[in-house]
């Protein structure tokens, strides 16, 4: 192994390589490899052979400009590869982001470990009455949460017991009963609950990673995937700090406003009192606009 390299490296990210970052109860994120840094974005934008200018404020200003004006290609010059362990039901949400290279642990070839996710009691809530895709904000009473957790754990343990019974093999692949024929792993796996953990390698460029983070760190995203996204956001901050600052400024803490929304703001600036009924916006649009300025 060479001890030196000519490629761009980031000391803060080098220190994170292969380190296990714990997520949820049994999950983790590990940075396996990366390519590029903030200077790579600047270099691509200027189509030069150097590392941009010698003045960091100019590089930072260019990155701000690129992100503010929705340039994409320069950010695609940076790549990062993760090793991630996550519950299957979160993996199925995650994989909807189809702009990454993924290789997942195969339960056809191997036996899944006996590890499953159980939420904290405070994270168990009823269905939201106003949003069809997420839970309500308030936790359920302690007695109800304890019952929910007991059911989730009981079902997971029972299903794993049947999983091993169907294969006639233990967690390490050893035959349980020589007189019994087990079924194929690819069939036995269908009995497992979605809170069991899977693992994958996930490689993505910075542009698409930022899109993933914008959606999955949002308060409307499911709590469990938000936890993973938050950890990855911290990694991005260490990897490309200028890009992170621009991303926070223009995406995470910024806002998109519609044409009607801009017209309402202009009317308000001119001294007009505008309410929902006179705004020309539907109820949801109006509430989203008002929320921006609260």
Swiss-Prot record:
It catalyses: dUMP + (6R)-5,10-methylene-5,6,7,8-tetrahydrofolate + NADPH + H(+) = dTMP + (6S)-5,6,7,8-tetrahydrofolate + NADP(+). Binds 4 FAD per tetramer. Each FAD binding site is formed by three monomers. Residues 27-250 form the ThyX domain. GO terms for molecular function: flavin adenine dinucleotide binding; NADPH binding; thymidylate synthase (FAD) activity; thymidylate synthase activity. InterPro entries: Thymidylate_synthase_ThyX, Thymidylate_synthase_ThyX_sf. The active site is at residue 216. FAD binds at residues 73, 96-98, 104, 205-207, 211. Belongs to the thymidylate synthase ThyX family. Catalyzes the reductive methylation of 2'-deoxyuridine-5'-monophosphate (dUMP) to 2'-deoxythymidine-5'-monophosphate (dTMP) while utilizing 5,10-methylenetetrahydrofolate (mTHF) as the methyl donor, and NADPH and FADH(2) as the reductant. PANTHER family: FLAVIN-DEPENDENT THYMIDYLATE SYNTHASE. This is Flavin-dependent thymidylate synthase. It comes from Rickettsia typhi (strain ATCC VR-144 / Wilmington). The gene is thyX.
